[in-house]
A protein has these predicted regions:
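N-terminal Rossmann-like FAD-binding beta1-loop-alpha1 element of flavoenzymes
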Residues: 31-55
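Flavin (FAD/FMN) cofactor-binding and adjacent substrate-gating region
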Residues: 93, 97, 118-189, 194-195, ...
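C-terminal catalytic lobe of FAD-dependent flavoproteins
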Residues: 315-387
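Short hydrophobic core segments
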Residues: 34, 218-228
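N-terminal export signals
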Residues: 2-24
Length: 387
């Protein structure tokens, strides 16, 4: 579906089963959630299932910003300290829960993640560090041999194999399709999706009263900022510091191909996955791509490297290139919760929101509606950035 058609479609009645509301919010709290990427969509959904009256405000279309350009590897790899690892791990489990709640419209591939490298000692040490770090925390990851790799990924060309690991709990999804499924589930629960550009958050005394947009004012008891890289501007209005730094990511997307791979594959310097629609997605090890441009030439090069790893993709054709700007906090850790001045304004900004969105949605429903500060988010409060 064209994302530009999404708003009118969502305006139509949506039928289907909906998960039981566990505990209603008191006095039908009115909550505005700004931003309908995966983070905002999850928060809105979880608030609505608690009985809140939720308005989800999006300036463009759901999943049209950072979410659209995400590689969408669901994992808790190389996340330290333990509290950050645990938040991501809760996110993995949360996606499995959401599949049960939402149903088949939320497609996730649970094939695990596999990384390997050549004989370079530094790369080998890095891979072994990953397993040695996470196994004591209970993460289902293990070192693998070349034979293991070739058994797990039939037809793979391993090259000069030095070391590898296999994480069985990891998954991946199409970020746009998954976010739309969350938005639709939220609407079934009572979320109102509104296309508008938020200019200001409005205040009276020590509380936010709503927002002013290009479509007029909206009133609420709580405001949640989940606006991706625009969270810095909006947070500043509420006195909440949300320092983000630029981190770009380029991905090559192929035209649809027959099903070939169900894992996330990470040979040295390359990331490979296949979406449910058959498109191969390739990037370069999740780092900031700097001054690189998303040119067709770069896309062709990435897909050529894919064929070097998966010979069955011979003949693969480039469809599109995407350039994304990650929501990367200055210290690389999530920025979660309310500020000091206005206790009913909350912010949610992090990388990777794709993994942790289900957990954040569940935790924010508690924090916003019950006024409880959850233990899982204590290490990630905005207060650490106050002067």
């Amino acid at each position: 579906m064209n994302r530009r058609q999404f708003f009118p479609v969502l305006a139509a009645p949506l039928a289907g089963a909906f998960p039981r509301i566990v505990r209603a919010a008191k006095s039908k709290d009115r909550v505005i959630v700004i931003g309908s990427g995966v983070m905002g969509a999850s928060i809105a959904y979880h608030l609505a299932t608690r009985g809140a009256e939720v308005t989800l405000i999006e300036k463009d279309a759901p999943a049209s910003g950072t979410t659209r350009n995400s590689f969408a590897w669901i994992n808790a790899n190389n996340k330290t300290p333990y509290s950050y690892y645990a938040l991501n791990y809760e996110g993995i489990l949360g996606w499995r829960r959401l599949q049960l709640e939402i149903g088949p419209s939320l497609q996730i591939q649970w094939g695990g993640g596999i990384a390997w490298c050549g004989p370079d000692p530094q790369q080998i040490d890095k891979l072994h560090y990953t397993t040695s770090l996470h196994q004591p925390w209970g993460y289902p990851i293990r070192n693998i041999t070349r034979d293991d790799l070739e058994r797990l990924v039939p037809g793979v060309h391993a090259g000069d194999f030095g070391a590898g690991w296999h994480s069985t709990i990891d998954g991946t999804l199409d970020p746009v399709a998954a976010t739309l499924a969350l938005v639709q589930a939220g609407i079934r629960a009572g979320v109102t999706l509104t296309k508008a550009n938020v200019a200001t958050i409005d205040f009276k005394g020590d509380r936010a009263t709503g927002v002013t947009t290009d479509k007029g004012p909206f009133f609420a008891d709580h405001v949640v900022i989940a606006a991706g890289n625009d969270s810095t501007r909006l947070g500043a209005q509420a006195g909440i510091p949300v320092p983000l730094r630029t981190s770009k990511g380029i991905l090559a997307h192929s035209k649809p191909m027959p099903p070939l791979v169900h894992q996330v594959l990470m040979p040295a310097g390359l990331d490979i996955k296949q979406n449910p629609d058959g498109r191969i997605v390739a990037g370069s090890n999740f780092g900031d791509t700097g001054a690189l441009a998303p040119t067709p030439e770069l896309g062709a090069h990435l897909l050529e490297r894919v064929t070097g790893v998966l010979p069955e993709t011979r003949g693969i054709e480039l469809d599109t290139m995407t350039l994304g700007f990650r929501v990367m906090p200055r210290d690389e850790y999530p920025i979660m919760g309310r500020g000091r001045q206005y206790r009913n304004v909350h912010v949610a900004a992090m990388h990777s929101g794709m993994t942790s969105a289900p957990a954040i949605g569940q935790l924010f429903a508690i924090e916003v509606l019950d006024g409880i500060e959850t233990a899982q988010l204590q290490d990630f409060r905005p207060q650490r950035f106050y002067a």
